[in-house]
Amino acid sequence: MLANRANRLVLKRLVHLNTSNIIKPICSYRSLASSSKSKTQFTKKPPISEFSIDEILEHFILKKKTIEGKENKDKNTIKVEKVNTKIDRFSSEVIIKEKNKKNNNIEDEDEFGIEEMIAKNNNNNNNPNNNNNNNNTKKVPTFNRFSTEVIVKSNNNNINEFENEEITKNNLNKKAPKFNRSSSGVVINTTSNDNNNDKNNNEFENEEIMLNSGKTNKKASKMDRYSSEVIIKEKNNEEILVNNNNNNNNNTTTTTNNNNNNKASKMERYSSEVIIKEKKDNNNDIEKDDIEKDEIIVNIMNGFEDKDESAVEFLKRHRIEHQVPKSTIYLKEKTMEEDEMVRKRLSVNRDNINFSNNKNRKQIFTKKNHQNGAGILPKGLANNIVKNDWMKRQMTDPYVAMAQKNDLISRAAYKIINIDEQIQLFKPGQIVVDLGAAPGGWSKYIQERVTNRGLVISVDTSSNFQLDKDCFIHGDFTLTETQNKIFELTKFKSLNDLKLYKHSLIHSDSKIQNLIENGGANGNGSGNGDLQKQPIDNMFKQKSACYVDVVVSDMAPSYSGLQQVDHSRLIDLQRLALFFAFKTLKKGGTFVCKVSRGGEEKKFFKLLESNFISVKSMKPGASRSESTEIYYIGKNYIGK
């Protein structure tokens, strides 16, 4: 009972001390349980009589001390919260601890906090604009995203010129550009190590750092997609050496390099290694570049016929100003050579081709020679030079190259050559009608096959016929007028007879003139007088017309671009050619025509089968794979 009374008296005295905050932990058994080591001791509510007065007083003293300590800390934190800033996205606990240690004269346990506070105090003392700095500390940018440990350490190395300037600039950066994604530690370590070198290095680095920090930070350009670590190392290790060499040799080159550094805009997507190597090559290998320029100018001049001094000067200026690469010059030389070769091939007289030797003809027109050939230009070169798709196709077509080499008029001649090689259409002494003959590729080959004992009559509505026009008729074959001209030419039956007739019109034969003057073959004037009344050409006109052996048709209408329309028009045109063949062909004759796939060609094929003993369809090797054209060959015409 006495113990309980004593405890109650102590509690009453505590109430008079206005320490109501202390009463709660003392009176509650839970707080005592938390202060003890084991919580299992207080499973039940203990009576107050079990605690002695000494224990209660000890708890009271401890709690009082802890509360006083918390009040002191709260006072300190209140002072700091007024000046608290978002310095480095780190908590201000380290700074507060270091302030407390400094006020209480405690030894330095954390070097980072004390050094950082000293650095900031020094900066505030050195800079006259302390008010501006204090205002700026309220809006310190999120600059580095890393700790300022390296910055503070580098400040202690007595390198005040660069670092003080950089710290002030960093404090003044209100917009806080996201400049380096790498740590600032690398930047400052490299600069601090380089500052221990010679004065020449320090001059270059200070200029470069001022440019990088002063200009590029304001614009906040996307300077490097690479880390700044590589750029700074390469610049410090390689570019400084280049600039030192240039300073010793040429004073002018340093100014140009500084101007180029001011324009460091489009540096991304390339590493600094390439830039530094190019600077070395441009500065150290000037003589090599001049030699290469002279060689390139000589190569350009080799392609021109006129080698005047004005042209040389123009090319030199063109080379120095625009810096033409070697690849374009190579292409220009090749194209000029190819143009000369094409001009030479086109200038050849196409009439002076002779296939009199049968062996030579087989060497030119066999399948092996023109099946896997090359075009006039390689495909890669043609794609770089020629823009027109049709010209690209022509320049890379092997049959075009073969036609120029063998002095043929067009590549279409190889179509009839392929058909003749397989079916053997033509023989010497035949009469052939070529419908749609212009420009004369088929007619030239067929005339060589039938020889001068045969005859090829060429008909076309176009006047672009590049052969001798003695056997050419300009007109529409469906008209009776042109058909009569064709029948008149068939009276000659051979090319030799036709040439003799043309020659007689120009230079009359002396024997014929004597017969006309004497009135007869005996010279007595008692002849029948037919030669006197009739002109000279009636001698050939007395011959009767004959039917032809072969009718070929490579005609095509003007294309509209609509596949079905063009197909039906082509079938109609070849049907007219077939009706013409019915009039002119002899029994056992041959008909060759071009059609396209589209549906209507099947009916036309059946029409051929009803008039010819054998009918074949064929796609020549010279016909392009993307084309829908095919050729129908009807042999052994039945006749009426």
UniProtKB/Swiss-Prot annotation:
Residues 175-206, 242-264 are annotated as: Disordered. Residues 242-262 have a biased composition (Low complexity). Residues 180-192 have a biased composition (Polar residues). S-adenosyl-L-methionine binds at residues 439-442, 460, 476-477, 554. It is an enzyme of class 2 (transferase). It is found in: Mitochondrion. One of its GO terms (molecular function) is rRNA (uridine-2'-O-)-methyltransferase activity. Keywords: Methyltransferase, Mitochondrion, rRNA processing, S-adenosyl-L-methionine, Transferase, Transit peptide. It catalyses: a uridine in rRNA + S-adenosyl-L-methionine = a 2'-O-methyluridine in rRNA + S-adenosyl-L-homocysteine + H(+). One of its GO terms (biological process) is RNA methylation. Its EC number is 2.1.1.-. The active site is at 594 (proton acceptor). One of its GO terms (cellular component) is mitochondrion. S-adenosyl-L-methionine-dependent 2'-O-ribose methyltransferase that catalyzes the formation of a 2'-O-methyluridine in the mitochondrial large subunit ribosomal RNA (mtLSU rRNA), a universally conserved modification in the peptidyl transferase domain of the mtLSU rRNA. PANTHER family: RIBOSOMAL RNA METHYLTRANSFERASE, RRNA METHYLTRANSFERASE 2, MITOCHONDRIAL. This is rRNA methyltransferase 2, mitochondrial. It comes from Dictyostelium discoideum (Social amoeba).
